[in-house]
Structure formats: C-alpha cells, structure tokens
C-alpha cells in the first residue's frame, strides 16, 4: 500500500469537498478548484476526511494512488491558505514594476518585457528587485514563476538574472589573466 496514498486527508472547517465520480471539487475561503482523478483511483469523503483508494496492486494503480492523494491535499491547502513563490531580480539596472494586469521587467534587453498574470494568479512587487507570485493552484503558481525565471536565467559568472527567493546560483571562476 502506498505510504502517502493511504493517509487520510483532513478537511478543515470552512472547506467543502465534493466527489462526483472521477471529479473532485474543493471549495474554500480563497476560491474553488476542481480535479479529475485517473480512472482506477477512487476518492470518497467520510467523517470530515477524504480517503483515496485503489482497486488493485498493479503498477499504474500504485503510482497514481499517492499522486491523487497529494493533488487533492494541495487543492485543500490552496483554497485555505494559498501558495506563493518568491522571485529576486539580480543585476545592475534590472528591475520589476507592476503594470496593468501584469508585471514589466527591465532585464538588459533592448526592450521591456511584459508578463500578464494568468487567471487565478496575482503578482506583488516589493521594491524594484523582489516580486511574489500568488495564487491558489500550486501547479499554476510554480509554472508562472518558472516562465518568468526563464526570461533571464541567472548566469553562472556574475549571477545576474531572475532567480527564486533563496536559490543558490552555482558560480564559475572567470578566465584567469596572464
């Protein structure tokens, strides 16, 4: 039995979990998320807990069991507290500012780069070189932060670029002069 999959998920007060066949809908104070679970896996709500079960011990069922339980648990955390991902902009002249429904970056290109916030995502900017991606969907928050980081990844010589908050950039030594 999957060690993660067999653990029941506690449903906190103020959160409503509805299971309709293979569709799980989670409603909470921050919003609503829905999830379609894979075919052999079943989910049910009992006594304020969500139980995820699998019908057999086939390889596919075992792999989907823990995944499904984690996805449902992530949705419950998302609608109660939400998710954040911090980004730091490092480099001379590199900056970020909120503009319309997104953010605008100056990252050393000949033009500013504008990133619009996807539905369900908001940006907060602290100063000119720190920002946070905020949302209730863990996967969408991480994907949006990764897409922003991809615009200008931290380079290994000076460390300039967009990095995650707390990320260590492996630095290389430059050319040694004569």
UniProtKB/Swiss-Prot annotation:
Signal peptide: none annotated. One of its GO terms (molecular function) is structural constituent of ribosome. GO terms for biological process: cytoplasmic translation. GO terms for cellular component: cytosolic large ribosomal subunit. The keyword Hydrolase does not apply. It comes from the Bacteria. Keywords: Ribonucleoprotein, Ribosomal protein, RNA-binding, rRNA-binding. PANTHER family: 60S/50S RIBOSOMAL PROTEIN L6/L9, LARGE RIBOSOMAL SUBUNIT PROTEIN UL6M. Part of the 50S ribosomal subunit. Belongs to the universal ribosomal protein uL6 family. This protein binds to the 23S rRNA, and is important in its secondary structure. It is located near the subunit interface in the base of the L7/L12 stalk, and near the tRNA binding site of the peptidyltransferase center. This is Large ribosomal subunit protein uL6. It comes from Clavibacter michiganensis subsp. michiganensis (strain NCPPB 382).
